[in-house]
Amino acid sequence: MSDPQPTAVDVRESVTSSLRVAVNRQIFRGILFSMGATALAMARLGVPQSMIWSFAKLQARNACRALGVRVTIRGKELAAEGGPYIFTPNHQAHIDIAALLGYLPGNNRFASKKELFDEPVLGAVMRTLGMLPVDRDDPMKSIDVLNRALREGHSIIIFPEGTRSRDGRLLPFKKGAFVAAIEMGYPIVPVIVKGTRRVMPKGGYLSIHPGNVEIVVKPPIATRGLDYQDREWLRDAVREIIAEEFSRPIAA
């Protein structure tokens, strides 16, 4: 039997979807450029970094809305007070960053590999937004950078997988975030991001489809009293919490 031929409705939906993705690509580029340029200009004018971060948060939310990405967050009240915290979300797509920036409560800081800060434009924007360079070859220096931000009252966002998942499955967690949390004595907050892989599939250059994204914040896990020998237990406990929630469908 021959394969069924696409109907006129199928063709129309495919064309409409392709057009929306193309439009979204330009919207995303435009918002990224305008946010970066405005943040740099604000910094040159001496605007406080807290105001620049608030502007970036607003722009991230506006970007999600303009792209047709509907973000909901559950459990944010668990991290609304008592911080600062170390947030450890899973990582499925680049748009995770926009969703977390826009919707996770607080004046937070992303930790990112230091090589990205060497990019002339990207690095300047990241520094302006207060993002934190992490040197995987110098963990003690990285802990010092993170600790300084925490002492200033900023929660930190670290992706424990270290990179985006290629197939949508949760990757093994690296130990760095958990060693840092134990060394510094700040609580870890497991965060689960769902739906972003369908919204922004890996491999498609800035291909963003309208869809639903859910962020789930779990209760903080205290690290005071833990020592270096507990790093693997803490890593595995956090991964288990994230894996259990990640396996559930997005709440209606």
What is each of the regions a protein language model found here?
Residues 1-19, 140-252:
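Non-catalytic C-terminal accessory region of glycerolipid acyltransferases
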Residues 63-64, 126, 149, 181:
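A generic structural signal for well-ordered alpha-helical segments
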Residues 51, 59, 96-99, 112, ...:
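Hydrophobic alpha-helical segments typical of transmembrane helices
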Residues 71-75, 95-97, 143-145, 201-203:
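A generic local structural motif
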Residues 33-53, 65-67, 79-138:
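Catalytic core of membrane glycerolipid acyltransferases/transacylases, capturing the structured
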Residues 60, 128-132, 162-163:
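Short, basic, glycine/proline-bearing loop/turn elements
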